[in-house]
Design a protein with these regions (language model features):
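Short glycine-rich substrate-engagement loop in P-loop NTPases that contacts/grips substrate
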Residues: 1-6
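Conserved catalytic-core segment of NTP-binding enzymes
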Residues: 11-106
Length: 106
């Protein structure tokens, strides 16, 4: 199936990548076939999130997507964390977004 192409390629190269502790796959922000392949091949996900007004909308979308992929295609997929980007501690909005993200995952 098309969703497993990256997982199959990484499995075929397991001798080459066995010496690495982590393999990072940088994906586009949309849920296309490339991102779906990465989620199927991955053990975990780190989500970069800009500290902006609609940030939590993106968080809820990605958590639903990860849950759906875990149920249907990759049972070992886990959300390992959110990495806040464009964070400006002088900006009240950045602090509010950080606080909201922490509350979302409690």
């Amino acid at each position: 199936r098309r969703e497993y192409r990256l997982a199959d390629a990484l499995n075929a190269a397991r001798d080459i990548i066995a010496g690495y502790d982590f393999l990072f796959l940088d994906c586009p922000p949309s849920l296309g076939l490339i991102t779906l392949n990465a989620l199927v091949a991955a053990d975990g996900v780190l989500v970069p999130l800009q500290a902006e007004f609609f940030a939590l909308e993106g968080v809820s979308q990605i958590t639903r997507t990860i849950d759906r992929v875990r149920r249907t295609l990759n049972p070992r997929l886990m959300l390992h964390g959110i990495v806040l980007t464009m964070m400006d501690k002088r900006n009240n909005l950045s602090e509010l977004v950080a606080s909201d993200v922490r509350a979302f995952f409690k």
